[in-house]
């Protein structure tokens, strides 16, 4: 079923550390504008909802209302409170997937090679796969690409 039978250890994420990073980065936002005050209220409600039991929740907020970071706050707090091993973040449109992943990485202080966030969808990584093993591609880049492929096959990353 898997292309590569090598063992890949599961990656551990420290939810509390990620929450602290997110909180620290969110402090830099302008708290005086009306829209940011509303975004902060939405985020705080999501953060508090993170302590609820596991279930299906809906976040209905207009465009520009801060859904991306509010829902990440919920997910991280919920994972911490309920002992979840991973977060699976489902987005309805491919067009916003890369943007959301970039926001997550930026706000959590993670680089593109981080093993905490995995961007997994039908075309993820295809831009790199044609270069794998070609001249000009370093062994380190090839190793990172193999690791990304294994992670996507086995979902060993904590924030998908």
Residue map of PLM features:
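N-terminal helicase ATP-binding lobe
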Residues: 1-160
């Amino acid at each position: 079923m898997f292309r590569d039978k090598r063992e890949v250890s599961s990656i551990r994420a420290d939810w509390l550390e990620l929450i602290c990073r997110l909180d620290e980065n969110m402090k830099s936002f302008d708290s005086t504008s009306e829209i940011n005050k509303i975004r902060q209220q939405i985020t705080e409600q999501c953060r508090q909802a993170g302590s609820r039991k596991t279930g299906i929740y809906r976040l209905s907020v207009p465009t520009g209302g801060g859904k991306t970071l509010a829902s990440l706050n919920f997910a991280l707090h919920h994972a911490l409170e309920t002992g979840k091993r991973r977060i699976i973040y489902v987005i309805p449109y491919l067009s916003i997937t890369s943007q959301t992943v970039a926001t997550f990485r930026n706000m959590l202080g993670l680089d593109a090679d981080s093993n905490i966030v995995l961007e997994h969808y039908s075309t993820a990584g295809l831009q790199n796969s044609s270069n794998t093993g070609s001249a000009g591609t370093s062994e380190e880049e090839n190793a990172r690409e193999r690791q990304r492929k294994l992670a996507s096959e086995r979902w060993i990353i904590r924030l998908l």
